Amino acid sequence: MTSQERIHAAIPIGTAKIWLQRLREAQSTAAHLAEAAALLVVMTLFRCLPLDWASGLGGFIGRIGGPHLGLSRRALRNLRRAMPENSEAENRRILRGMWDNLSRAIAEYPHLARIAASGSGRVEIVNGAALTGLATTPEPAIIFGSHLGNWEIGSSTVHRLMGASVLSVYRAANNPWVDRLMRRFHRTRRAVPKGAKGGRELVRQLRDGGSIALLVDQKQNDGIAVPFFG
């Protein structure tokens, strides 16, 4: 019997599985903490910069680095399927624009309250009285937003106008520490994560006469499976 076999024989299989599971959990926690720490550093940098500088820097980083990430291969593949008439150059232009927009949205995250603030000059509100009116009426309402530009600005603006009378739904980050950090920038927003529990909260909000807000393309994995992009 080799030394390795003797070690395996000395440790019960059940105990070994428990220790392996704990090791995986520790590795996952360490990775999550490292990811959250890196995000905190980046967000602190963007927060210290003027808004336009932060947005511009975020866009520059996205345009330069984003197209080289593995996700870009999937994006290009979907673009070719969705718009086969496009040239490869046009698809890559769209791809760079996508990364520019996403990176700007991330860089603007620490500035959301400032962007959505009354009198900031950054947001044009058309018929805002309709939203403020909903905040004082017992009739429930469902507010839909489009997932375009910096969609978080729309959410922040709706919550500023309606206050506690509106409840929104969001997709929680896979990393719980990152999720907690991102929610800190929305301290005044009432929101629930998508899913069964969040769905029950939304129904309760409507039954109580409140309003809910959500994006029109909120993804639910427990829906009906249909063919999409192959």
What are these regions (language model features)?
Residues T2-G145, D179-R184, T188:
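Membrane-anchoring hydrophobic helices of lipid-metabolizing enzymes
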Residues A113-G230:
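Soluble catalytic domains of membrane acyltransferases
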